[in-house]
Amino acid sequence: MIEEKNIVEDYIRGGTQKNFYTEQDSVFCSCPLCDKNDYEKIDTEKGLSIVRCKNCELIYTNPRAIDAEKNYYGEVDIFYNEARLIFKGTKKHHRDKNYEYELEKIKQYKSKGRLLDVGTNMGFFLRKAKEMGFETEGVEPSPSLAEIARKSWDLTIHTAFLKEADLPENHYDIITLIDVFEHVTNPKDLLNRSYSLLKKDGIVVIKVPNGDYNLFKMKLGKITGKGKGMDIWDCYEHVVHYTPGTFRKMAENAGFKVKASFIPLPIHSPIWANLVGHYYQYPSPFILDWKRVLLRNLFFYIGRIEFGLFGKSRFGPDLMFIIEKG
């Protein structure tokens, strides 16, 4: 296990997240889907712009933070302490219900087999997959997070980006990218690499924030005047913002076809930082966060109906896709 250290009073999460990004902190890029440079700016957050490609309609952050993945390159102790009671087995993770739901969905298509998780973080999703009988393996570029996942859950974790990891081709039944794909600056390359690692009848499972939901929140914030200062896009770390249509284009361009798509359970992020000044990964007490939880659940159910009728949704916070080789 990781050695536990005392939490300092002025608790700071690991990594390099900034409140504002200057020209020196950011870099311009072409569209990650069609490689064009013809776009319109639709929002600004933390000094970074959210734009929409005029050619393919992909929404992406441009300019984006340089080395955005280093938000997760902090010290082991700091990351460990924000979830230490989970590692001790006395608390659940605030996303455990989400992970169980997502794995049950996966089991509808692949009930067992080799599962490669890309962007494993501290291993919370992968340890659930292991508990549910999958043969698990993970890839995590952050040395700190990979170390925690490896030592805390006895998981096989490669400390690398997927493109660098020494992995066998045509080997995996399932590749998962849960809340990861939106962080990837080169999504086409990642899909191509996933294609080569996947068995002929394998599946890739990808969960991302819903770009249409963020657009709705952005417009609502402007109408109500409450949008200023809100982290709607999380653009300091989210570099691409997918809608059902743009994700489908990205997947099909890499040789995949979309087997299934749906609105997954909403994430109820904890509010400990507001309550006690520290960020922890345990669920917030319902009595202190009930309004936000109920509203998010209401949006989820409305969004699921809307998605079933129209194939897209303004109310579902996230999207989940199961894709297979075409």
Per-region residue spans from a language model:
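Structured helix-beta-strand junction loops
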Residues: 132, 152, 200-201, 254
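S-adenosyl-L-methionine-dependent methyltransferase catalytic module, highlighting the catalytic core
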Residues: 177, 185-196, 203-326
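Preference for short coil/turn "hinge" residues that link or interrupt alpha-helices
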Residues: 155, 160, 201, 232-235
